[in-house]
Amino acid sequence: MTVIVLSGPIGAGKSSLTSLLAEHLGTQAFYEGVDNNPILPLYYKDMAHYTFLLNTYLLNHRLAQINQAIRDHNSVSDRSIYEDALFFKMNVDSGIADPTEFKIYDSLLENMMEQAPGNPSKKPDLLIYIHVSLDTMLHRIQKRGRKFEQLSTDPSLKDYYARLLSYYEPWYEKYNASPKMMIDGDKYDFVANEDARRKVINAIDQKLIDIGNLN
């Protein structure tokens, strides 16, 4: 069984790389389902009010994906359950979200992860982090065109996105739940450039070989 999860900020290319990897490896792809998330547009309008509700909704969604991934044995997911708390913690540190709500969420996350079936299967076999600069992040957010994410809708989102990036590097450095690797999303445009795509896929294949999950 090989379970791969993608991580990275908004606009990093997680869903695109998930599709490419799932096709390459012949595995099931699982997506965050942003377009079907009824809370996300509300969150962007009022983060203080909706942070707890959004993260609880996402936690339930991720655990359902984990259960399905275990049943399917091989899968690639475009968002890691381990990084959801990063968004919540950032909002607490910024004074947007309530610290008590974060403690409740963190306890809920821990308890629900304990109930996930199959002790080894709680953790992925590989986490792939896509690193991007703020310029690349903003360009891709603008390109995909979700209205509630756009700076033209809310210019203050630029500061929010910049803060989010500043939280990701320390989070990735501390992450130790599974083997991990970093992809440079600025250097390798794996969506538009075939050569970059091939290099990224080859690097992931080699990592899977190194950790014993690909022959």
Swiss-Prot record:
EC nos: 2.7.1.76
Any single Pfam family the record assigns to this protein: dNK
Family stated for the protein in its record: Belongs to the DCK/DGK family.
GO molecular-function terms, A-Z: ATP binding; deoxyadenosine kinase activity
GO cellular component: cytoplasm
Entries under CDD domains matching the protein: dNK
Primary role: DGK/DAK plays an essential role in generating the deoxyribonucleotide precursors, dGTP and dATP, for DNA metabolism.
Subunit organization: Heterodimer of a deoxyadenosine (DAK) and a deoxyguanosine kinase (DGK).
Entry keyword annotation includes Ligase: no
Active-site residues, record numbering mapped to chain: 78 (proton acceptor)
Top-level taxon in the UniProt lineage: Bacteria
Binding, substrate: 32, 44, 55, 79, 84, 149
Name of the featured protein: Deoxyadenosine kinase
Catalytic activity: 2'-deoxyadenosine + ATP = dAMP + ADP + H(+)
Binding site for ATP: 8-16
Keywords assigned: ATP-binding, Kinase, Nucleotide-binding, Transferase
Cited InterPro entries: DCK/DGK (IPR002624), Deoxyribonucleoside_kinase (IPR050566), DNK_dom (IPR031314), P-loop_NTPase (IPR027417)
Ranges that cross the membrane: none
